[in-house]
Regions:
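Lipid interaction determinants
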Residues: 21-85, 96-164
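Positively charged n-region of N-terminal signal peptides that target proteins for export
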Residues: 1-4, 20-21
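Sec-dependent N-terminal signal peptides
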Residues: 4-14
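Extracellular/luminal ectodomains and secreted, surface-exposed scaffolds of diverse proteins
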Residues: 88-90
């Protein structure tokens, strides 16, 4: 009898652990502003983003598929530097994620809960938190990312005049 109870308890614990690992969150919860909480390259120490490290990343996911990504650095003088990474579009459906028209990847974003995701980029493991930032801040960072994309006509003129 004790063996049977032990087996049942272990089976129940295993089932509970599996269900805790498979959090189901609606795809639309990705919409909004996300800030990197931590990152860890394989074989290296975990970096906690924020004031102490002076580094973080920002991602914006719009309801219409708009996507913006930037790095944020805090200088020794206390100034924030926004380093635009990219601006374009994203898709996210049933665990399949793509940004900037790249091939979709299954489980590139894994839900921990409604406001936390984890994922791996190359060999870096990231944790992201959904945050409410002032609209003015979000607009500024997204606009910085937009200006990183040089218009096609300007690109062509630069190529013709500087890269002959």
């Amino acid at each position: 009898m004790k063996k049977m109870m032990l087996v049942m308890a272990m089976a129940l614990m295993g089932a509970m652990q599996v269900s805790a690992q498979n959090v189901k969150v609606d795809d639309k919860e990705l919409i909004g502003t996300w800030v990197m909480e931590s990152m860890q390259w394989e074989g290296e120490k975990k970096t906690v983003c924020g004031k102490e490290s002076g580094y973080s990343q920002f991602k914006f996911y719009g309801a219409d598929g708009e996507y913006a990504c930037a790095e944020l650095a805090l200088t020794k003088e206390g100034k924030v530097v926004v380093i635009p990474h990219e601006y374009g579009t994203y898709t996210f459906k049933d665990g399949w994620y793509s940004e900037m028209g790249r091939e979709a990847i299954k489980d590139a974003i894994v839900w921990v809960d409604k406001t936390t995701t984890k994922g791996t980029w190359m060999k870096r493991h990231d944790i992201w938190k959904k945050v409410n930032l002032p609209d003015k801040v979000v607009k500024y960072i997204v606009d910085c990312c937009k200006t990183k994309n040089t218009p096609a006509d300007i690109q062509q003129m630069i190529k013709q005049s500087m890269f002959k």
